């Protein structure tokens, strides 16, 4: 059964092109280390909530856009091994490829896929 890493972040709207380049580099690295796919989505219709919402979860500011991303892996074992290699890869080190957003507000988690229709 596939495994998925999911991410939500608030990215400065003016940094969309910078974010895309960062994400393209990261996607190549993840795929080299075993990921099946990497999907990056730029917020288009992401309403603010009263109790909960994507914007509230990442403390999205007026000049930011919510980004929703996920990475699929063939298994948790492949993900665990691949993630170690990804984190050590020189192409994704902060001095080489800094995150174009506030990583302190990044939300992420690993999920077992239970339906894939």
Describe the role of every protein-language-model region:
Residues 31, 37-62, 88-117:
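Glycine-rich beta-strand-turn "strand-cap" elements at beta-sheet edges
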Residues 1-21, 25:
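Long, hydrophobic N-terminal alpha-helical segment
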